[in-house]
């Protein structure tokens, strides 16, 4: 799937502006941003449920879409929902494939019960199962772990990993559960003020956060004015927090060369939550 210069306007309001990215087969990509920045609008455009004001989408015809609040036939069983959609889309019900998915999603004990008896999390897992009826090449998932406890979330994430790895499905996930995005996604797209920015995801690609306390305002100001190691993401009195892909030894060498006195120094790996919060300031 390729998104080319996609923009969306509602009257004078610009929701999306010149969005460009690709979703490759076998890749899992995260989409994050504050409420109301256009994530759901972008997803609807990707599956042709909404039209862009300008730009193009190059995509397979076989795209599965999970909305944040999926609609299910509550008076029917899970299996009846599944067979109904198979018939609606004109595809054969693949008992072997869906028997395996039902088991992987821990739905075996629920699949023959009426959906109205399901918990929110079980409904969500059934909704994900239904998006797989057509064996899509691409999946667009809006809050796929919504309503799920930690154990059920892990079950869903494992299924998504298997789909990407073994069936070469490209998956775009929007979620406020940043820990899920961090665990499963190879890339993350930040939607901010109608624009997309990119940030690699994964333990090996994260920067470090350095919390540095200086002995004086002069030392602090010299460091801020001269350093080219990374971004200052927080400044409070004599203490700053900096994000950068550098070694602590490089910083201490810089301190010594510039006669900068430091009274406290801490470092930790920057998480996706850190990145998100820093970008949202």
Q: What do the PLM-derived regions correspond to, one by one?
A:
Residues 32-34:
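The feature captures the beta-strand-to-loop junction immediately N-terminal to the Walker
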Residues 47:
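Helix-to-loop junction immediately C-terminal to a conserved catalytic motif
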Residues 1-3, 16:
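Conserved structural motif at the start of ABC-family nucleotide-binding domains
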Residues 157-241:
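ABC transporter nucleotide-binding domain
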């Amino acid at each position: 799937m390729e998104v080319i210069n996609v923009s969306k306007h509602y009257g004078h309001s610009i929701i999306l502006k010149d969005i460009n990215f690709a979703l490759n087969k076998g890749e899992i990509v995260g989409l994050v941003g504050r409420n109301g920045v256009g994530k759901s609008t972008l997803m609807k455009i990707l599956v042709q449920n909404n039209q862009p004001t300008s730009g193009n989408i190059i995509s397979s015809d076989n795209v599965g879409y999970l909305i944040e609040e999926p609609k299910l036939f509550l008076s029917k069983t899970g299996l009846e929902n599944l067979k109904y959609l198979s018939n609606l889309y004109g595809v054969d019900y693949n008992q072997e494939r869906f028997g395996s998915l039902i088991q992987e999603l821990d739905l075996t004990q629920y699949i023959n019960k009426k959906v109205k008896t399901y918990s929110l999390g079980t409904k969500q897992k059934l909704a994900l199962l239904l998006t797989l009826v057509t064996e899509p090449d691409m999946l667009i998932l809006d809050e796929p772990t919504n309503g799920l406890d930690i154990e059920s979330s892990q079950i869903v994430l494992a299924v998504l990993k298997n789909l990407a790895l073994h069936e070469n499905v490209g998956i775009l996930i929007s979620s406020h559960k940043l820990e899920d995005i961090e665990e499963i996604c190879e890339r993350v797209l930040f939607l901010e003020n109608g624009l997309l920015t990119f940030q690699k995801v994964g333990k090996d690609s994260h920067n470090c956060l350095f919390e540095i306390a200086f002995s004086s305002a002069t030392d602090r100001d010299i460091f801020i004015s001269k350093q080219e190691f990374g971004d200052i993401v927080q400044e409070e009195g004599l203490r700053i927090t900096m994000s950068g892909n550098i070694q602590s030894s490089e910083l201490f060498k810089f301190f010594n060369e510039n006669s900068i006195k430091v009274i406290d120094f801490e470092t930790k790996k920057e998480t996706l939550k850190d990145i998100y919060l820093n970008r949202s300031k």
